[in-house]
């Protein structure tokens, strides 16, 4: 397991609130859309995130991770803009920090970006909105920040005098991304079977916890799973003297240094003839 960077020291919440006020001052409009195929809001949001992380990678930065709670909040705030005749952070719903607290999102610093584009959601919407943010230094500095580690995008369409409104909500938060694990190989020598696996903790720009250990799960002939190793840092396991004529399976789950536990992997099995 490769060692992650040390977890950043949490910032004082009072300072974070002051910084947030500066973060949310930027907003932008976008040039009118040309004719293009209609798409879903979810596809536009995913495309913007892909563009953001492409440019972060080019600058040697780690990706921003999508947080579904931030995306839900961003969707709601975009809908507020679509329903309002005013384009502002206040019209989007006011204090983002208070909203984050209300839905239980832990944060040290938050930021919000707004954009609008004439017309409906099309295949050109993501590039147009991201292009506007990219060409605005205040917006660009937030998206390429070394502080923020989570993001959520939201979009909404005003049908009368059609416009698309886009919102990005960013936070610097503790690592709450579950680590991943997968089985790699299953081999046999006589009645001894050996399994290997790997795990990783998705990297964050800040507060990255890093992979800690695994739990190992075992079953025979599709029976009940039982955990046979807890908190092991091993990435292989040999089991000897297995009874012939049975199928033996292993699966693993990973844990990071922040205590986040990932899903149990797909199992891998081998039969002893």
What are these language model-derived features?
Residues 200-220:
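Solvent-exposed loop/turn segments flanking beta-strands in beta-repeat/beta-sandwich domains
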Residues 3-38:
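Secretory targeting and sorting signals
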């Amino acid at each position: 397991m490769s060692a992650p960077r040390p977890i950043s020291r949490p910032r004082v919440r009072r300072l974070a609130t002051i910084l947030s006020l500066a973060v949310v001052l930027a907003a932008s409009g976008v040039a009118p859309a040309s004719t293009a195929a209609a798409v879903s809001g979810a596809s536009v949001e995913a495309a913007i995130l892909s563009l953001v992380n492409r440019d972060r990678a080019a600058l040697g930065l780690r990706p921003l991770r999508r947080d579904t709670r931030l995306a839900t909040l961003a969707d709601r705030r975009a809908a507020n803009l679509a329903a309002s005749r005013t384009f502002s952070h206040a019209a989007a719903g006011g204090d983002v920090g208070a909203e984050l607290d209300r839905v239980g999102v832990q944060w040290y610093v938050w930021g919000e970006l707004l954009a609008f584009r004439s017309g409906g959601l099309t295949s050109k919407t993501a590039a147009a909105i991201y292009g506007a943010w990219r060409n605005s230094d205040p917006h660009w500095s937030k998206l390429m920040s070394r502080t923020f580690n989570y993001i959520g995008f939201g979009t909404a369409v005003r049908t009368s005098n059609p416009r698309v409104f886009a919102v990005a909500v960013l936070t610097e938060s503790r690592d709450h991304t579950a680590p991943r694990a997968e089985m790699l190989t299953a081999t046999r020598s006589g009645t001894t079977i050996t399994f290997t696996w790997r795990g990783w903790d998705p990297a964050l720009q800040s507060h990255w916890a890093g992979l800690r250990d695994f739990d190992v799960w075992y079953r025979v002939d599709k029976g009940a799973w039982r955990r046979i190793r807890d908190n092991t840092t091993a990435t292989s396991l040999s089991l000897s003297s297995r009874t012939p004529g049975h199928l033996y399976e292993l699966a693993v789950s990973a844990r990071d240094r922040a205590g986040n536990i990932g899903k149990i992997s797909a199992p891998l099995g081998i039969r002893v003839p």
